[in-house]
Amino acid sequence: LSLGLMPYSIVGYNYSMTETAPSSITAGSLKTDYTYTGEGGITQLYFGLGFRPFSWFSLGANLQYYFGSIEYSSSASFEEVYVPTIMQRTISVTDLSGNFGVQFTIPLKKEMSLTLGGTYQLKSSVNADAEQTIITTDTVAQNFNNSFDFPMSFGTGFVFNYLNKFTIGFDYKNEFWSDVEFFGEKEFLDRNKFILGFEYLPNPNGRAYFERVYYRFGANLSKSYYTVNGEQLRSLVLSTGWGFPLKKGLNPTIMNFTFEYGLNGKVEGD
């Protein structure tokens, strides 16, 4: 049984570009400055259940509730026009989805084990309320309800454990964003994610409380599902966390805390 809250998608960018083209007004050229910004994100609240029919095999499922809002803005400023054209869009999301997973544990020796696993995320259509405002010499505002897709995805990975104290894991995940529609349009690219993690448990049966605390470190590398100047941005996220035992026994209760710090790639253009 698990319950958690985590970010699903975080949007945060601000970039600009300049284009020069022949002017239809004068004999010279016309310079246009474009600016694009985006901020906000979608959060996932999940509730999970697991079942182990055999000592070497287990399966589970998560029910996921998504909520949040994202604000997009784009503007075009023309050299010979004093009033820029600005488009602002705010999208609010609330909906449910789910995923499934299986894992197999292979005992290597008495003190070592290898666990292999896989996950599958359902493709789901998400309800969204959107407000769009276009500002020129006049202001036009629209409110509409529509839907867009969250992609199907699959993941696979392994976990190696030694002495029930040292654990290292690696996961690979592929999200099929190129198959989804965003307000009727397909405008994204598939996204890959690589995740590496390490966990240390000083003494599973120790008397001292902090000997039974789990200490965790991790990193993941991924590409964005959108492009900037024709390039996908790389993202690196570093994390650290702790698992605090609340109850001993064959099925212990553990409260987990995780902190993450992320770095997004930069794209330079003219």
Regions found by a protein language model. Give the residues of each.
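Outer-membrane beta-barrel porins/channels
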Residues: 2-270
